[in-house]
From Swiss-Prot:
Name of the coding gene: rplK
Official protein name in the record: Large ribosomal subunit protein uL11
Family (UniProt): Belongs to the universal ribosomal protein uL11 family.
Keywords, comma-separated and alphabetical: Methylation, Ribonucleoprotein, Ribosomal protein, RNA-binding, rRNA-binding
GO annotation, biological process: translation
Keyword presence, Ribonucleoprotein: yes
Length: 141
């Protein structure tokens, strides 16, 4: 078995099921010589069950212009906004609070995100979620 030579690793955040050749995807992949439409079709097929979720994706481009990609869980801030039905966090997080997260919601987000975190303990993941929530102007009960 021969190992393909990696020439580039591209990291993007793309809404699930909505990849298209427009910027930022097209220029990033075109510069690496990747078939842009091929990536868009594969990504959209793989993420059709997560429409609209902002998904981090890591694209590995090989010397023969083939690629593989790994999709990750949405960022914690996106999960919090989705849970509380918010458009954005507070512009002044220390003064203006825009919502409240319960411990059950924090735990659900932490469990979902732990797959991508380098954390073993649920308590550590919960603290990270709580910190992100506070920086967005959201109270944690």
């Amino acid at each position: 078995m021969s190992v393909k030579k990696v020439i580039k690793i591209i990291k993007l955040q793309i809404p699930g099921g909505k990849a298209n050749p427009a910027p930022p995807i097209g220029p990033a992949l075109g510069a690496a010589g990747v078939n842009i439409m091929g990536f868009c079709k594969e990504f959209n097929a793989a993420t059709q069950d997560k429409p609209g979720d902002l998904l981090p994706v890591v694209i590995t481009v090989y010397a023969d212009k083939t690629f593989t990609f790994i999709t990750k869980q949405p960022p914690v801030s996106s999960l919090i906004k989705k849970t509380l039905n918010l458009e954005s966090g507070s512009k002044i997080p220390n003064r203006n609070k825009v919502g409240k997260l319960t411990q059950a919601q924090v735990e659900a987000i932490a469990e979902q995100k732990m797959k991508d975190m380098d954390i073993v303990l649920l308590e550590s993941a919960k603290r990270m979620v709580e910190g992100t929530a506070r920086s967005m102007g959201i109270d944690v009960e």
